[in-house]
Swiss-Prot record:
Belongs to the jellyfish toxin family. Type II subfamily. Oligomer. Nematocytes. This is Toxin CfTX-A. The fraction containing this toxin and CfTX-A shows potent hemolytic activity. This fraction causes minor effects on the cardiovascular system of anesthetized rats (at 25 ug/kg), since it has no significant effects on heart rate but produces relatively small increases in mean arterial pressure. Residues 19-25 form a propeptide. GO terms for cellular component: extracellular region; membrane; nematocyst; other organism cell membrane. Residues 1-18 form the signal peptide. It comes from Chironex fleckeri (Australian box jellyfish). Residues 27-61 form a coiled coil.
Length: 454
């Protein structure tokens, strides 16, 4: 193999990844544009939408030239000084614009931008303080917190996308290098520097931490994002596995690197075990994982979850418990094991409740084309009403809608927690009244919401 050719490849890969720069305009023109925005922000009255609009314009201006990064903090501070004018309004407009700006600064400039970021964080703190009185309710705070989460998550997605581009370049490099055969120790050293395993492992570590937190979250949006991050995590882990495998093949061509090759092989096995441990909860769920599970199951409801299952098999995770059905069953409550789901008619309504000592199966559970399940009892399809802690009612309609598209989350105990496509974080349970009506509970309803399908 030509040593100079390898050096060229490594430099090409590094250069390609490090020099994705945007088109730059004349610095004076950009500076003038930013100064106009500063004046516009100084003249803002009580219209928070105008602030967001100005920040969006700033995003365009500041993207044009890295030399303007020092001016970002000035603009942000200008926005901050305008906050005293606000006595009411939609704080999210301001926060959204600021987070957009922060994202632009982070993605546009490779140099230091800590001052600008600090200024944005300080600004958002000011917003929180400003709206902390009567004008700032918990709903608005939740929106702002969600905006922060979305921003951080987007940074992580961008990191994974960058790693994916790196993988494509490096795997092509490795395959090209291995074709020549008879790799020397000097060439091997160059190849080793071209394989960014540390970078991949760092991103995987961040994703793993994110998954560990999200797997037990009771927040619906957080749980849904966690499933997406599991998909990204498994994609990246597979890329790392592929890189290491190809690297081992090259190491085998160098007699002096045989011990090194064995060590790398051991690390490959350790990595696979670590991935299995991270995603094990998917097929061995506890009640604390149920909200996340309600977005993963039914597995065949989306291409993403089907891909997760394929990746899980690649890393040796056993198949999940039964989570699709097609027949007539008894649905037994865990807390009251002699009670089962049944149905009664009340003032023209068909209400699902608990009945004791049901001897024969009567609940029909059937998979829909979209992967969800439909529950039917004596001609009535069960659905959850939209009332607080909704009731399980029956409808004669063939399509009960998303309120009647059920998710069966399999627990490792052998029981199931049941929610709907409409409200994945609300689970079916049997209330402790004399009638034992079937209702839904936000997050974990306890053993009253665990069901065995017989």
């Amino acid at each position: 193999m030509d040593y100079a050719f390898i050096v060229f490849l490594v430099c090409f890969v590094s250069g390609t990844l490090g020099n994705r720069r945007r088109a730059k305009r004349d610095v004076d023109e950009v500076t003038s544009g930013i100064n106009q925005l500063v004046n516009q922000l100084n003249n803002v009255q009580q219209d928070t939408a105008a602030i967001k609009s100005a920040l969006e314009e700033l995003k365009t201006e500041v993207s044009a030239s890295p030399s303007t990064v020092s001016q970002v903090s000035e603009v942000v501070n200008t926005v901050g000084s305008s906050l005293t004018k606000f006595t009411s309004g939609d704080a999210f407009n301001i926060v959204s614009g600021c987070l957009d700006l922060l994202s632009t600064v982070a993605s546009t400039f490779g140099g230091p931008y800590g001052i600008a970021i600090s200024a944005v964080i300080s600004l958002v703190s000011s917003i929180l303080s400003l709206f902390a009185g009567d004008g700032f309710d918990s709903a608005t705070r939740k929106v702002i917190e969600e905006a922060f989460k979305t921003h951080r998550d987007q940074e992580l997605r961008d990191s994974v996308n960058g790693a994916r581009r790196t993988f494509n370049d490096v795997i092509a490099f490795l395959k090209g290098a291995s074709k020549h055969g008879n790799v020397t120790e000097q060439e091997l050293e160059v190849i080793s520097k071209g394989v960014p395993l540390t970078k991949l492992s760092d991103t995987l570590g961040i994703l793993e931490s994110r998954i560990n937190r999200g797997s037990t979250s009771t927040d619906a949006a957080e749980a849904e994002r966690t499933v997406e991050f599991i998909f990204l995590y498994l994609q990246l882990a597979t890329m790392r596995d592929t890189l290491i495998t190809n690297f081992i093949l090259i190491l085998k061509q160098v007699p002096a690197a045989d011990t090194y090759a064995n060590a790398v092989s051991i690390s490959l096995d350790a990595n696979k075990e670590s991935v299995r441990e991270t995603i094990d909860f998917l097929h061995n769920m506890e009640a604390k994982n149920a909200v996340c599970g309600a977005y993963y199951y039914p597995i065949y409801h989306s291409e993403m979850t089907k891909s997760i299952l394929s990746f899980a098999k690649f890393f040796g995770l056993p198949d999940p418990p039964r989570n699709t059905f097609g027949g007539v069953y008894r649905v037994q409550n865990r807390y009251w094991p002699t009670w089962y789901i049944c149905k009664e008619s009340y003032m023209g309504n068909h209400m699902f409740r608990g009945c004791s000592n049901v001897r024969s199966p009567s609940v029909q559970i059937r998979a829909l084309e979209n992967g969800y399940q439909k529950i039917n009892l004596r001609g009535k399809n069960m659905y959850i009403t939209k009332h607080a802690q909704g009731w399980a009612w029956g409808t004669a309609d063939n399509d009960p809608g998303e309120q009647g598209y059920f998710v069966f989350v399999p627990l490792k105990s052998g029981y199931y927690m049941i929610s709907t496509k409409k409200w994945p974080n609300y689970f079916v349970y049997m209330e402790s009244s004399a009638s034992g009506y079937i209702r839904s509970w936000n997050h974990n309803p306890g053993l009253q919401g665990h069901w065995r399908i017989l």
